[in-house]
Amino acid sequence: MKVKARTFSGTTSNEVTQREIANRALARKAATEGFVLLKNEGHFLPAPKGGKIALYGAGAVKTIKGGTGSGDVNERDYVTIAQGMKNAGYEVTTEGWLDSYVKVYDQAREDWKAAILKKAEKMESPNAFFEAYSSTPFFMPCGEKIDVDAAKADGADTAVFVMARIAGENKDRFDKEGDYFISEEERVLLAQVCESYKDVVLVINTGGLMDLAFADAFDNIRSIVQYVQAGQEGGNAFADVFTGAVTPSGKMTDTWAKTYNDYPGAEVYSYKSGDLTKERYEEGIFVGYRYFDTFLVPVRYGFGYGMSYTDFVITAGKVSVSNPGTMDPKVSVEVTVKNTGDTYAGKEVVQIYVSCPQGELVKEFRRLAGFGKTKLLAPGEEQHMTITFPLYQLASYSEDQAAWILEPGKYGIWVGNELNTSVLSGALELDQEAVMVQCENICPLKEELKEIMPFAKKVQARELAWHEELKAKGIVPVAVKAADIPTEKVDYQKIPEVLPGRAGEIVEQMSEEQLVQMATGDPGKDQGNALGSAGISVPGSAAETPLVAAEEPWNVASIALADGPAGLRLKKEYQVENGRIVPTDFLSALEGGFFAASKEKRGTSYYQYCTAIPVGTLLAQTWNLDLVRELGEMIGHEMELFGITLWLAPGMNIHRNPLCGRNFEYYSEDPLLAGMMAASMTLGVQKVPGCGTTIKHYACNNQEDNRMGSDSILSERTLREIYLKGFEIAIKDAQPMSIMTSYNLINGVHAANCYDTCTRAARDEWGFAGAIMTDWTTTNVQIQGECTAAGCMRAGNDMVMPGMEEDHENIRKELKEGTLDIRELKRCIYNTVNIILQSNQYEEAVSYENQFDGLGEWLTVK
């Protein structure tokens, strides 16, 4: 195999390329499909094109395109909502207010910068700056009050008010004014806007949810748009939806509660419990809509909710079960969707929920089992769809049996365009219990945990009610026989005596020291151990694998890894002098170089402009798997262009609580939706030869405060059904090249050192074939317990990132003492080398997905 010759990444030309233009157009399309229209009183939107418009709020001119930290992208430029409205032909009447806001904002940013630098000086951590930065969130200033009389006379009837919030890794949000709640200054400003203009459109430019009770007090807020954070083309995309050039089709991927305290465990989440060392998952499986729907708690906007400019009628048809007697029985639901409006074309999302029988295992009232998005339907046009999903999607986990089981009884099938209004449309009936997968128990609890449960009588009454509804509708359940459902028995593997293939040959030829070096990344002598910018050959990349086996007979290339998940995070400009890259520090790669000291440029400049796509939550709100797959392929081609092999994305943890600082990176409160989005993104990226994704953060990364020392305490059933399920789906449906473990502990064991999740679940149960890596500095910053590099090797966590000499010392020490078996080390290096040999660093690279059968078939729509 021939390793590609290394060249400097990017281009010496600063001209906008056709690649940038095309990719921005796709990012814009994705944003338009992800915006959720929450309110549209009197069909106020779409608004007439052109004319005068008033813009207020922090996000109008300082629109937040994405979150902070490793999820940020250093794009060429981005379009604010204000610029997008101007591009659409509107005359903005509030230029004076916007200009004054920019000055207020810029000063606030400088003050924030100074506070962080001062805080970092007092810290002794090797990652002092990043810790100071990520633990000191920037709160958007409100802006000045307005002159009501002047505003009334500015000629605009409509005002757009953009609420904005910033969040990022290492710090959870606050349930206080100015964050989850509207600040008093914002309330006063909004009241002035509502007094000054006839009609107001409220835009929510946040990475997560916020309390919207304030909106009820203003009668002339006609429309509310959930904008989230829409990437670099967000402003243009908003104008597309505002004017009706695109009909909104986004749907909520979370439940928007009436009040924060309605969320289960709200009062003890993260810092609110007073103990950041333990996070007790007492809500069990009742997360998000599973809680609200089961416990009958009223909500503001339900899971799957979203309005359109047109109307649709969804008619459910035949329900069937296929592939009996195989390991993959399927359920299919036929649906017809018709656009019954007379003006606007639009897309609709069909959602299928299932009520599983309440037997020995108490279950949620309904769970998402399948979904599909229509094509663009003209007025009067209809589309016939068959949505097919695995029967396994309806299985529940029994800890007593250590098995995924289907309990006997009726399985009600609900069809609609959101959870709360879905209609009981069909059913299955299983004659007796079926064991679908026989496993072994993993991640046992080490202390007592009492989970909430619904009242048994209410559960039984609701189940009886929908059984009676089936009879009243004349629906005859489709009979399913347990005898037609074979049991898959997991074969838990031992380390093979002989490692297979070319990768095995190479590993067996390596010296012990080469193996030790290959167990970590190579941070680079010039870059230090900076979080997220330890790459050498591709400036701004997160890390590289070492070159200790680059010569014959091994010929193992070094691969570069880049952060995400809203696009590739690289330095958009770097310099080359005398044939060498001029070294820069971490600050130059953060927030577009905002924190870096000004330096004179030396040598020739190279440019790496990557596309900033919408954040994960907004992508999931599209409910469009084909579109996400197309975005993945786009990112794969950018990886190919800049020499990146592994994209450290997608992020796919569950939205357990709206205050999690990193929710913007993740998709949903539902594991099926999260898993399918990650699978689709992976299938797109990995279509490009030698490129791969890194699904993260595995697992239970549901809070950011004390993320390296927090112990997620939860039952095995909750772990498997909610927090591992999305990863399971992504692996089985897309086979990502790699997985990144999380910082936290799971029932007392560090995720990076957890054999149960890294090996028994991912590899033995789900068939994962790629490499696993730690998150950055997992083994170097200890808060609770000890997480070691040797512990990673024992667990089957193959790459310690970004790689430090102390990691090598730890591995050498444990090999010498016999607490680490050389075969355990070789197994990990084999997994890494196996991926490297299939990377885009070789001339002969092909699509990684080619070697697997049955990918992309978990959920199909025809």
Which sequence ranges carry the predicted segments?
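Glycoside hydrolase catalytic-domain context in secreted enzymes
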Residues: M1-S396, I405-L419, Q438-K862
